[in-house]
Each structure stands twice: as C-alpha cells, then as structure tokens.
Swiss-Prot record:
UniProt-listed GO biological process terms: negative regulation of DNA-templated transcription; response to redox state
Protein name: Redox-sensing transcriptional repressor Rex
Gene Ontology molecular function: any one: DNA-binding transcription factor activity
Binding residue positions for NAD(+): 91-96
Organism: Staphylococcus epidermidis (strain ATCC 12228 / FDA PCI 1200)
Family named by the database record: Belongs to the transcriptional regulatory Rex family.
Residue range(s) of DNA binding per entry: 17-56
C-alpha cells in the first residue's frame, strides 16, 4: 500500500483481534482462512472483515481465503512486533501492581521496563523484576530509556498533571485506566480504558443480542 496511506482508526483497533486469531490458527497448522470463519470466531460481521482486509493488500484470493502466513507478516509489521516495545507504568496501586506483575506475559514483544509512584513505602520495591522509582524521575528515565508508551493508573485527580509531564517527556502513546478524560496534543495518542463503561456495554449486548 502507498506510504502515505492510512488505515482507518476503527480498522486499526481490530488489528490485535485479527492477529491473535491468525496466530492461533497458525498454531493449529491451518494455512488459509475465509471471512466467514473469522466472523464466527470474533463475532464481527463478514462485510466489516472484508472491508478491513481490503486495506491490507493481497492477503488472499476470492474463493481461496486469506493466507495465514501473509496475514501474520502484515500484522507483525503493522503492530511493530519486530521490535521490542518498552513500556512504563505510572501509579502502582492495586491495578498498577496487577498489570506490572502480569507484565504482558503472553506478548514477548512488549515489556513494562519502568514503574513509578510517589509513595515512599513502595519506592525501591521490586515487582515483576521491575524496581519502582519515584515519579520525580519520570522525565529523565523515559528520555534516557527512549520510552514513548505509558500505562496510566494514577488517581484521577492527578491524571491530567501526569499526562502533561508525559507529553514533555516525549511520550506518544498513553493507555489511560483512570476515569479522567485526559487531554493531549494531537500527535499523542490516548486510549481510555473504563471498566464501568465496558461492563455497561457488555450488559447492553447481553440484554439485546443474546436471544
């Protein structure tokens, strides 16, 4: 595809779903898959899948399905799996500690390498082989370690302040678990994860689409 071509945001958000399914199929020794199978596995309608895949180039032929190896190669390049992605997490409360302990154990390409908090009792603690540093060290550490992706699990009343500091440190992506809808410049991507909203959405679909 042309270098200046941009895949739609909605399609990009589905890439990890496609990649995980294709990886599973590859592990089962399957070399081709059609949109119907993908649709049934992911509960995404076939038309959406075909439209998404039309942005991905020549991954298959009509009547033959999509080539698993070609899809894996494409998804790896788009999701930057060829490079080790270093991530920092800020706010080591219950959620932050759980994420740090888990530390993407099934994703070898992503690793939380830095953790920050302000509480004296947790500074210096080793959690999941990562030593917690004081938040005063965020900017210098992120710059020296060339980290531009951060998970934010701070209290919501300081989330925007921390986000502003992250922008100054050159961060380009924030996964925000706080209730605060933080604001950043256009070149800084923020994904908001709100468990309450996700549960409400789940309950809605259970009520209206499970019959």
């Amino acid at each position: 595809m042309p270098d200046d071509f941009k895949i739609p945001r909605a399609t990009l958000k589905r890439l990890p779903l496609y990649y995980r399914l294709v990886s599973i199929l590859k592990g089962k020794g399957i070399d081709r898959v059609n949109s119907k199978t993908i649709s049934e596995a992911l509960q995404i309608d076939s038309a959406t899948i075909r439209r998404d895949f039309s942005y991905f180039g020549e991954l298959g032929k009509k009547g033959y399905g999509y080539n698993i190896d070609s899809m894996l190669e494409f998804f790896k390049s788009e999701l930057s799996e060829s490079d080790q992605i270093k991530i920092a997490i800020i706010g080591i409360g219950n959620l932050g500690r759980a994420l740090l302990t888990y530390n993407f154990s099934i994703h070898d390409e992503m690793t939380i390498t830095e953790a920050f908090d302000i509480r004296p009792d947790i500074i210096g603690e080793n959690i999941g082989d990562v030593v917690v540093k004081h938040s005063d060290d965020i900017k210098t550490t992120l710059e020296s370690e060339d980290i531009d992706v951060v998970i934010l699990t701070t209290p919501d009343n300081v989330a925007q302040q921390v986000a502003d500091e992250l922008v100054k440190a050159g961060v380009k992506g924030i996964l925000n678990f706080t209730p605060r809808r933080i604001k950043t410049p256009q070149d800084v991507q923020v994904h908001h994860i709100d468990f309450g909203i996700e549960l409400q959405s789940l309950l809605f679909f259970m009520k209206n689409y499970s019959k």
